[in-house]
């Protein structure tokens, strides 16, 4: 990597996300049974939907945690908690990436018995998840297709008046 380049870019397509989420679902299939899936918003919503469909799980909730501002980490802020999950026993918590692990650690404080899974994990975040598919280097910046600045992003249509 050149001195001018501070990170490696890893752009992902919708097809790659789907394939990787299905691979994660296969790894999780024998670890259940699951009461439901909790998607960490917003990055975990697409993978959680794919995984829930693959595992035939109908109960899906969200855990809204804010941990990124621009491209730098900051302290986690819990915006919305899932209801009726107790200590998390039997629940599957999904996010797209475990970067530093802070988001998963915050979630684990609320639901210590849940199973935590991500498609991708960086070295600092690997210990925060129970299951993941792919390890990526610390200096890799993953570009998800649902992010507005990505070429595969499709903006919502304007409402018809």
Each language-model region and where it sits:
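PRPP-associated nucleotide enzymes
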Residues: 1-161
């Amino acid at each position: 990597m050149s001195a001018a380049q501070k990170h490696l870019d890893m752009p992902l397509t919708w097809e790659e996300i789907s394939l990787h989420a299905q691979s994660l679902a296969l790894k999780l299939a024998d670890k259940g049974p699951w009461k439901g899936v909790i998607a960490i918003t917003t990055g975990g919503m697409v993978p959680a939907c794919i995984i829930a469909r693959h595992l035939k799980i109908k109960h899906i909730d969200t855990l809204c945690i804010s941990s990124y501002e621009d491209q730098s980490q900051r302290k986690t802020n819990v915006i919305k908690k899932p209801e009726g999950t107790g200590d998390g026993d039997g629940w599957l918590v999904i996010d797209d990436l475990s970067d530093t692990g802070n988001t998963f650690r915050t979630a684990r404080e609320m639901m210590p018995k849940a199973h935590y899974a991500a498609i991708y994990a960086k070295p600092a975040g690997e210990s925060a998840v129970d299951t993941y598919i792919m390890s990526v280097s610390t200096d890799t910046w993953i570009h998800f297709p649902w992010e507005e600045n990505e070429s595969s992003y499709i903006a919502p249509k304007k409402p018809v008046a």
